[in-house]
Curated annotation (Swiss-Prot):
Protein name: Succinate--CoA ligase [ADP-forming] subunit beta
One Pfam family recorded for the sequence: Ligase_CoA
Lineage: Bacteria, Pseudomonadati, Pseudomonadota, Gammaproteobacteria, Lysobacterales
Gene: sucC
Binding positions (substrate): N264, G321, I322, V323
Organism: Xanthomonas oryzae pv. oryzae (strain KACC10331 / KXO85)
Cofactor(s) it depends on: Mg(2+)
Length: 389
């Protein structure tokens, strides 16, 4: 789950990490009220969407007067914005964040994440903030510093001070940096986060460090115990079909192709998409119907796939381990009847009760194309889509 900047800053502030004063507004007049309450300008007005790159897209404005604040908010609110991170998708701007705007002396980068390679929680820091860390890694890798945290010791103040000195901070700032690192570690663990990125972590003209922007990713598997984070979810920023899928507890990701996929198991689902690509097709989605799939779940999965008008064919690839192939077959037959599937459907079944499942499909009288294996199924669905065009 992703979060808006204002939500990220709220969490940072709760854990003692300094952020500029600010508040969100839903109308231009509210934006002016917020600016006035913050005191004398200047201010920043920032569009709240689930994406970076807002500045280049016109979503971050420096304002010297309340008239500027009102104009900036009016230009953003109620519109949609795409950035280099949204892959052409336009996201609605329902809120703007109005904050104080201090003069930036220096921009740093700081993040904390799970490093699967070292199996540790890892900090990444750089003296080059305000730009994409991938760009820094490619052009000046010597400016990036990493710290793998020992699970027993945790992160200590001396880790942060050492990091701070490597970034060129003075003694006072290095102490602040250490405090931020320690608090960030606590936030990361207590909220079950997968990533926290502060970019930039800036030194302002008062000589102190502030988190000017924050990006959070949470571990959805821990959502059951993170009610505060779940309440922050903004479904208007998400793909509508993916939201529906999450409510049904189906793992679904929209893709750009025209061949819908229904598979059980994430690994098999990814392999299925790969084999479709190898056979000249383009998957329209990732869909893991889950090991505990039942008839109704299969029907809902078909509805999700066919909610996209781009889908011109469907490949159902099921390995019956926990789930039974005959039950999947019953779900496919019911789905084709209920949803009114008008595109070619290729089905590959293997595993528990496979013969019973195949017999049900044969006896259904429906134009369902059987496949012997994953490659055969991919070839058949690609061919069927071409022939139907």
């Amino acid at each position: 789950m992703n979060f808006h900047e204002y939500q990220s800053k709220q969490l940072l502030a709760e854990y003692g990490i300094p952020v500029p004063s600010g508040k969100v507004a839903a109308t231009p007049d509210e934006a002016v009220d917020v600016a006035t309450s913050l005191g004398k300008g200047p201010w920043m007005v920032k569009a709240q969407i689930h994406a970076g790159g807002r500045g280049k897209a016109g979503g971050v404005k420096f304002c010297k007067t309340t008239d500027d604040v009102k104009a900036a908010a009016a230009k953003m609110l109620g519109t949609k914005m795409s950035t280099y991170q949204t892959a052409g998708v336009e996201l609605p701007i329902n809120l703007v964040l109005v904050t104080t705007a201090g003069e930036i002396v220096k921009e740093l980068y700081l993040s904390i994440l799970v490093d699967r390679g070292t199996k540790t929680i890892t900090y990444i820091a750089s003296s080059e903030g305000g730009v994409e860390i991938e760009q820094v890694a490619a052009e000046t890798p010597e400016l990036i510093h990493a710290l793998n945290v020992d699970f027993v010791e945790g992160v200590q103040g001396y880790h942060g001070r050492d990091f701070g000195f490597k970034l060129g901070l003075n003694a006072k700032q290095a102490g602040q940096f250490a405090s931020i690192m320690v608090n960030l570690y606590k936030l990361f663990n207590e909220k079950d986060l997968a990533l926290v990125e502060i970019n930039p972590l800036a030194i302002l003209d008062d000589g102190n460090l502030y988190a000017l922007d924050g990006k959070f990713d949470s571990d959805d598997n821990a959502a059951f115990r993170q009610k505060q984070l779940v309440a922050m979810r903004d479904k208007t920023q998400e793909d509508e079909t993916e939201v529906t899928a999450s409510e049904l507890d189906i793992n679904y990701v929209t893709m750009d192709g025209n061949i819908g996929c229904m598979v059980n198991g994430a690994g098999l689902a990814m392999a299925t998409m790969d084999v479709i690509k190898l056979n000249g097709g383009e998957p329209a989605n990732f869909l893991d119907v889950g090991g505990g799939a039942n008839k109704q779940r299969v029907i809902e999965a078909f509805k999700l796939i066919l909610s996209s008008d781009k889908v011109e064919g469907i490949f159902v690839n099921i390995f019956g381990g926990i789930v039974r192939c005959d039950m999947i077959a019953e779900g496919i037959i019911a789905a084709v009847k209920e949803v009114g599937v008008k595109v070619p459907v290729v089905v590959r079944l293997e595993g528990t009760n496979v013969e019973e499942g195949k017999q049900l499909l044969r006896d259904s009288g429906m134009a369902i194309i059987p496949a012997d294996n994953i490659n055969d199924g991919a070839k058949k669905v690609v061919e069927a889509v071409k022939n139907a065009a």
